[in-house]
Every structure is written in C-alpha cells, then in structure tokens.
From Swiss-Prot:
UniProt xrefs under CDD domains: SANT
Inducing stimuli: Constant levels during cell cycle. Activated by CYCB1.
Domain of life of the organism encoding this protein: Eukaryota
Record-level GO BP terms: negative regulation of cell population proliferation; negative regulation of cellular response to caffeine; negative regulation of DNA-templated transcription; positive regulation of DNA-templated transcription; regulation of cytokinesis
Protein name in the entry: Transcription factor MYB3R-1
Keyword list, A-Z: Activator, DNA-binding, Nucleus, Repeat, Repressor, Transcription, Transcription regulation
UniProt note on tissues of expression: Expressed ubiquitously at low levels. Expressed in roots, cotyledons, flowers and leaves, especially in vascular tissues.
C-alpha cells in the first residue's frame, strides 16, 4: 500500500516544481533544470570544480552536475560558497568607494566596481547604490498622498515593484516593497473606511518616470558604456536574482505612460537632483514652433484675361492670404508677439502713410516665398534663394525708358510702390527688417530712394501689366531720380540715354533711346506688342550675370512697324577670301549717315563698300571688271552662302601669305585665256598696221622686204608677243603650268625673233594696262 501511495505522488511533485519555476521566472532563457536547494554533496563538488578550473570556465564546471546550469553554479559560488565573500553591514569606506567609482564608471559597470571592493560582488554594490547611496532617493517619511498612490497603483499592477516605481518618484523598488509589506497593507481597511480612496479615484493616475533611481545627473554621460557589455561577461549578468533582474529591467527601460486628463497633474515634491532631471525631461515635451523659413505665403494667381475684364473695379475687397507650412495650414501656438517679430503683421495688413490699416487692394500674379530672403547676392544668405518676379518687371529694368516707369524711383514710393496717388499698393515683405532683427545688422539695399520714407528693406512684388497703364505714367518730380534702380544686387544695368535704340550689349549695360527734351521719356508706346501669355514667372537669378542678359528674348513679331523709328542694322560683312560672316555692331538706324562714326574693328571705311555691293571686293582685286565670265562666276558663287555647292570651291582659311600664292596662281591661269583673246585682237591690229604701212608714200627697202613677205612678218609678230608674255610670267613659275594654261608658249622662232621689237610698239593701250597690272 505504501508503494501504491508513493507512485502517484511523484508526478504531482514534479508538476508542482514546474509550476513553481514557471510562476517564479516569467522571462529570460529557458532553464534546463528546475531543481531546488543545493545539497551538501553538490556544494562539495562545486568547490572542487571551481578550484580545478580556477573559477573561469563555468560551463565546464556545470558539466560536473547533471541538472545544474552554469548560472546556478556561479550564483551558488559567489553568494554562498566563496570563502572571500564579505557579508554584513557596509562600512563608511566602502560606501565612499562605491560613490567615487559610480561617478567614474557610471551606474552600469558593477562588475568593474566590485573588483575594487574585496569580498563584494556586483549585485551587492548595485543594491547598495540604488537602495541607499543614490542621492536621488527620497529618504523622507511616506506621506498620505504617496500611500494612496501606492494603493491605487498596486490595484492595477500588483506586486510589480518596478512598475510601481514609475508612480512614486524618489522611491526605490526595495523601499516600496518594504513599505507595502510593513505598513500600507495593514492600513488598507482604514483607507477604505475613511473614503479617501473614493476621492482619489476621480483624479487620473499619472506615471512619472523615476529617473532619479536609475541614474543621477552626475554620471549620465557614462550611459553609453552599457552597449559595450555583453551577456555573460559582466558578473552582474549572472549573479542577479529574480527580483534584481526585474528591477534592473525596470530602471533601465523606463517609459512614459502619462494619461492626460482635465484635472491638474500630480506633481510631488522632489529633491534638487530629481527636479533637475525632470526639468530636462520636460524640456523635450515643449510644443514645436516652426521656424520662419518654413512659412510660405501663397497669393492666388489670376489670369490676365480676368484682370482685364474686371479692370480692377472691385479694389476695396480684401483677399485672403493662405499661410501654409510644410505639413500644416496654420501656425500652432504662435503668439502675436512672435508674429510681430517675424514680420507676419505686414503680410496681413498693408500700412499706408497715415498709419491706418487697409486691406490688400490688388490681386497678384506672383507668389512670395518668405524662405528666400531678397537680399544682396553677395550677402551671407542662401545662394540658392530666388525671388520670383514677372517678365513685365524684367522689362522695366531692362527697358526703363520704354516702360515709362518713373514711379519706381520717385520720392513717394515708400510702402506703396506703384502709383500711390490711386492707392494701389503692392505686397511688401519686411525681409530686411527681419534679417536686421535676427542678426542685429541692417543690410545695405541696392535701391536708394531719395525720400525719407524709402523702401527700408521692403521687397515689392510687381503688379500686373494691365495696372501698369495707369501706374507707369511719367510724373514730374524734382526729387525723383530717373535712373536710380538696380536689380537686387545683380550686375549693374546702367540706364543710359542715347540716340540709338534700346539694346543690350554683352557687358550688361542697357542702352535706351529717347528724347532728351522729355526728360528721357519717349513717346507713349509701352509693351503692347508683348503678348499677355508671355507674362510668366522667371527667377531673378537669370539676370544676375552679364552672360545671362543676352538670353532674354521677348516676342517682337507682333510689334507694328513704325516709320522713321529706326531699326537694328544687320548687314554682316565678310572677311576676304573666306565665307565667315561676323555680326554687325551697327547701333544706328539704317537710314542715317552715322555709320561712319562707329567702327568696332577699325575697318569701317574699308568694308563700307561691301555692304552695298552684291559681291564683296577683294583687297587685291583689280578695279576693272573686264575679267573672264568664269572667274566672275566663281567669285560670285563664293560670296553667296546660298549658292549651289557645285559652284563653290573648297573653303580656305583666313588671310595667309602662303595660301594667297595658290590663289594668285589660279588667277593667272584664268587670266591667260583672256590674254590669248587679247593677242588675237593684237593680230588684227597688227594686220591693220601693216596695211597702213603699205599705203605710206615713202617706204624703205627694208620695209618693202618685210611687207613683201607676209609670212615672215607674221612670225615676227608671234615672236614679239612671245617675248612680251615671257616678261609677264614670273620666274618661279614652271613652263609646264604655262603649257597647261592654254596660253602662248615661250618658244622662240628660228626666223629672227630679234626683229620683233618694232612690232611691240604697236600694242593697244588696253593690252598695255593688262601687262603693267600683271607685272605688278
């Protein structure tokens, strides 16, 4: 019967042991053994194993046991069996050593700290610090409020002392556990009877992170050392008990569980260290105020057709300015003082000269970005910042006389830039004032009005073109500088008054034409020829360099042709012997006679005839035009870029003395054909001369012999012509080239070439002119 009674009890005991182990340890790695107390035999085996392995390899030590782990063996040795273990009260010297080492290593390196305290382990040092030596510990007597909070928190979390620490700042888990077991548990009935708990139920239970227990402000810098520690290396990782493990997790990984309610928060009294830590934690919970650069003002964009149809009749209606940020549509928590400091007050109200608030009276096509500060380009601002302006504003800067913009430089511009007489204002942003408020320096603006109420840093957005008809009328102001505007610190665009048309050269200067009698303002013509579709936003940086000024094009196809207004003269002259045109720099009207006054390359007098001729003259060509048709055709084909390619020769380089010799040879080859024709005409003239000689009354015997033999005379003429041609051919020219040219050969006649000298005197004057020119 005894055996039968013992048989069923064995599984129950093992089941109870398993349940006990599972209930006692809810986290961490699974244990291989759930065996309870150590027997004296196991303690003796453990001591021998530690002596054998010198207390280093605990895995080898655990192999000496059947159901023990390395952690169990380590804890048994360190806490119980180690003969060097010091148990009992802490001395004053030990407490001072722990305080110094915590300030040096931080409240995490307990194994390192325990090495400086012989006989003490890391667990003992940690518990001594958190329960007694930590300056953030509240050692005062428990108050009634703290006890009521402990009761309410214990109703929710039970015996989880680490969780209860969050509601009781300054109290450690050990002190909370001791006070609960010793005092509060006995007072529960009295608290329920008095009704104090019912009164506290209405207020929310606030969990405050008990940072003062886990760390102190003097060694918060050493928290990063925890990442270097690994499980199993430090002694405290293996020597912590169940309660200390939960405590370490609760003190290291604390979270804020704040439940917001309508009542006031529970803020108990703290010590100096605790107040400093909580104030640091509360500083991160302040509301976020977006910076001024994140704010953007968006102005509704209205097409030009709508503006022209309305004709600004509804000028008194106010328009909304939608203030947006990167993520929200409003600025949360921004006070009126902040708005006044940031300059937002000017964006919502436009102040006139009398100081009265008026609503915005104008719809704009542009958008203002407050993040882009419209300061000088050489200032210490963002180089990528851009200010958006319209094409019409660009025209006012590039062609100030054509735009008749005198109001922008008048002394009354102040806050209302365009036409202050009609009360039409423009949206101004006090960017310079904001910059001066932040940096303490007033930036120098490139726009300097003469009046006392200058711009003062206002960045004015231009109005639409339809409003410019009323606002851009010239006004006679004695104090108004006509040419005193610059383009936001870009390259200076000097406005000059000249007799030429408005023209932009590559150096960034603006040349404008107009009558000096009218004060620099020409007749009223405006920019009516510019289509309204071209009024688009362009970045201001496109006018910041002189090289970009030439890239601005305005459609001028629809501009009506006007007589006696003049135009840009573009007749590109050409270099000699090359088909390379260059741009004419004529800045005067084509019908004027002032082209002689301007010569960019110094060859105006030389090249002036080429502009009026269909074929440009060469520098070495003869003034006579009796050349062969082939030569004239080739020269004409080379001068026209649209001629067929079959008539063109290969393009030569620019003028070169070496290449000109090839050109001279070709000219001489072509001239020999015309010379042969002249020789044929010479034969006719000589024949006529022979007839005249035969008709003379007195004839010498020698002349009779010459006339008697016409064949001999013909040979003499050939010899004379050959001699003349030899004189015309250069010495360095080969006879082979002369043969190929088809001209007369240089072979002498056997029948007396010396007798042809008299025949050479009868050469015609035209032939003599050719001979003299070719010899040169």
């Amino acid at each position: 019967m005894k055996r039968e009674m013992k048989a069923p009890t064995t599984p129950l005991e093992s089941l109870q042991g398993d349940l006990k182990g599972k209930q006692g340890r809810t986290s961490g790695p699974a244990r291989r053994s759930t065996k309870g107390q150590w027997t004296p035999e196991e303690d003796e085996v453990l001591c021998k194993a530690v002596e054998r392995f010198q207390g280093k390899n605990w895995k080898k030590i655990a192999e000496c046991f059947k159901d023990r782990t390395d952690v169990q063996c380590l804890h048994r040795w360190q806490k119980v069996l180690n003969p060097e273990l010091v148990k009992g009260p802490w001395s004053k010297e030990e407490d001072n050593t722990i305080i110094d080492l915590v300030e040096k290593y931080g409240p995490k390196k307990w194994s390192t700290i325990s090495q400086h305290l012989p006989g003490r382990i890391g667990k003992q040092c940690r518990e001594r610090w958190h329960n007694h030596l930590n300056p953030g510990i509240n050692k005062n007597a428990w108050t009634q409020e703290e006890e009521l909070t402990l009761i309410r928190a214990h109703q929710i979390y039970g015996n989880k002392w680490a969780e209860l620490m969050k509601f009781l700042p300054g109290r450690s888990d050990n002190s909370i556990k001791n006070h609960w077991n010793s005092s509060v548990k006995k007072k529960l009935d009295s608290y329920y009877a008095s009704g104090l708990l019912d009164q506290c139920q209405s207020s929310p239970l606030i969990a405050l992170q008990n940072k003062s227990i886990a760390s102190s402000s003097s060694w918060m810098h050493s928290n990063g050392d925890e990442g270097s520690s690994r499980p199993g290396v430090d002694a405290e990782e293996s020597e912590c008990s169940q309660a200390s493990t939960v405590f370490s997790q609760s003190t290291n990984d604390l979270q804020d569980e704040v439940q917001r309610g309508n009542e006031e928060y529970y803020m108990p009294e703290f010590h100096s260290g605790t107040e400093q830590q909580i104030s640091n934690a509360a500083s991160h919970a302040e509301p976020y105020y977006p910076s001024f650069k994140d704010v953007k003002i968006v102005v509704p964009e209205i097409s030009c057709e709508t503006e022209c149809s309305k004709k600004f009749q509804n000028l008194n209606c106010s328009h909304e300015l939608r203030t947006t940020t990167a993520t929200e549509d409003q600025l949360p928590g921004v006070s009126n003082d902040a708005k006044q400091d940031r300059g937002l007050e000017l964006l919502t109200h436009n102040m006139d000269n009398g100081g009265k608030n008026q609503a915005l009276q104008q719809d704009f096509q542009s958008s203002v970005r407050l993040s882009d500060q419209p300061f000088l380009s050489n200032s210490d601002t963002d180089p990528e910042a851009q200010t958006l302006i319209t094409d019409e504003e660009c025209c006012r800067v590039l062609f100030p006389d054509n735009m008749k913009d005198s109001s922008t430089s008048s002394g009354e511009q102040g806050r209302n830039m365009v036409d202050p007489q009609n009360g039409k204002g423009s949206l101004c942003s006090q960017a310079a004032e904001t910059h001066a408020h932040e940096t303490g320096k007033v930036p120098a603006l490139p726009w300097h009005p003469s009046s006392s109420e200058g711009l003062a840093g206002h960045n004015c957005v231009p109005l639409l073109d339809s409003d410019l008809k009323d606002s851009l009328l010239p006004r006679n102001d004695s104090n108004a500088p006509i040419q005193g505007c610059r383009l936001f610190g870009a390259t200076e665009l000097e406005c000059k008054t000249d007799t030429n048309d408005g023209f932009i050269d590559t150096y960034g200067h603006v040349t404008s034409h107009g009558n000096d009698d009218n004060g620099g303002f020409p007749e009223q013509q405006g920019l009516s020829y510019i289509p309204k579709d071209s009024l688009k936003l362009v970045p201001l940086n496109s006018f910041s360099s002189p090289s970009r000024v030439n890239k601005i094009y305005f459609p001028i196809d629809d501009k009506p042709a006007e007589k006696d207004k003049g135009a840009l003269c573009y007749e590109p002259p050409r270099f000699p012997s090359a088909d390379i045109p260059f741009f004419s720099c004529d800045l005067v009207p084509s019908n004027s006679d002032l082209r002689q006054e301007y010569s960019p390359f110094g060859i105006r007098q030389l090249m002036i005839s080429s502009m009026n001729c269909t074929t440009p003259l060469r520098l070495w060509d003869s003034p006579c035009h009796d050349r062969s048709p082939d030569v004239m055709l080739n020269d004409t084909a080379k001068s026209f870029s649209g001629a067929p390619s079959i008539l063109k020769k290969r393009h030569r380089d620019l003028l070169s003395p070496v290449l000109d010799r090839r050109k001279d040879k070709k000219l001489k080859r072509a001239a020999t054909s015309s010379l042969a024709n002249d020789f044929s005409r010479l034969d006719v003239m000589l024949d006529e001369g022979d007839d005249c000689m035969t008709s003379r009354p007195s004839e010498s015997p020698e002349d009779k012999n010459i006339c008697a033999s016409p064949s001999i005379a013909r040979d003499n003429r050939n010899c004379a012509s050959a001699r003349l041609y030899q004189e015309m051919i250069p010495i360095d020219e080969e006879p082979k080239e002369t043969l190929e040219s088809g001209g007369v050969t240089s072979m002498q006649n056997e029948n007396g070439c010396n007798d042809g000298g008299a025949s050479a005197k009868n050469v015609s004057p035209s032939l003599s002119l050719h001979i003299i020119w070719y010899q040169l």
